[in-house]
């Protein structure tokens, strides 16, 4: 429970996730960054309005099977959460949000292709690549409010991000791909300006400015400039 004014002061739920999925994790991250204190009770009871969505809609799927519609929306919202926060949902065992600092990260990916581009794009603020990306933008832009024309750049374009990560996309594996989910935490823990190598990745850290507060209010200028 919280006061209505506190909910409204940060713009309420982010329509980025409409109609559902990850909007709750997003707003709890924003509550925490805005200094709200969390109190958990085992004596409360909240009715969750089950079976009102499309997850197990018997008109869309068989009983007990998640509908393709729900799975597609869940994946769409997960990708948008990563685009916004730079990582997937993180929390403690008691569900308290873990919110790493939010850095400005650019990927420089050689030997890329459209499939790898689809996997990589959400995890950075800018991606400089050697694969043509117009077709990807045309297919993916309808799934996000983030401006993909601003985000995708040619390999030879000037690299302007605070943190640059260079790698050969053809060498990505299931194991080393987890690097992207941990990158914001790793940068925060290291606090090091300069160049470093890890596995297939070459990092050039020019600045460790934290942009996290720009994600609290959905009307913040820094955040809005990333959207269409």
Task: Give residue spans per PLM region.
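C-terminal, non-catalytic tails of nucleotide-sugar-dependent glycosyltransferases
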Residues: 1, 37-38, 54-115, 119-130, ...
């Amino acid at each position: 429970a919280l006061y209505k004014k506190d909910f409204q002061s940060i713009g309420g739920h982010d329509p980025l996730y409409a109609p559902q999925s990850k909007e709750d994790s997003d707003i709890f991250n924003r509550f925490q960054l805005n200094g709200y204190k969390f109190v958990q009770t085992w004596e409360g009871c909240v009715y969750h309005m089950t079976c009102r969505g499309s997850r197990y809609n018997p008109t869309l799927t068989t009983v007990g099977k998640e509908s393709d519609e729900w799975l597609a929306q869940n994946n769409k919202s997960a990708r948008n959460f990563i685009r916004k926060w730079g990582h997937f949902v993180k929390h403690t065992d008691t569900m308290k949000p873990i919110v790493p600092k939010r850095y400005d990260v650019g990927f420089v990916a050689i030997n890329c292709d459209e499939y790898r581009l689809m996997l990589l794009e959400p995890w950075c603020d800018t991606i400089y690549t050697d694969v043509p990306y117009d077709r990807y933008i045309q297919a993916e832009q309808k799934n996000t409010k983030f401006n993909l024309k601003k985000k995708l750049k040619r390999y030879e374009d000037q690299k302007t991000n605070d943190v640059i990560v260079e790698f050969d996309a053809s060498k990505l594996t299931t194991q080393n791909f987890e690097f992207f989910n941990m990158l914001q935490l790793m940068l925060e823990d290291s606090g090091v300006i300069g160049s470093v190598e890890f596995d297939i990745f070459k990092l050039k850290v020019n600045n460790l400015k934290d942009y996290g507060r720009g994600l609290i209010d959905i009307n913040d200028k820094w955040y809005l400039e990333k959207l269409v």
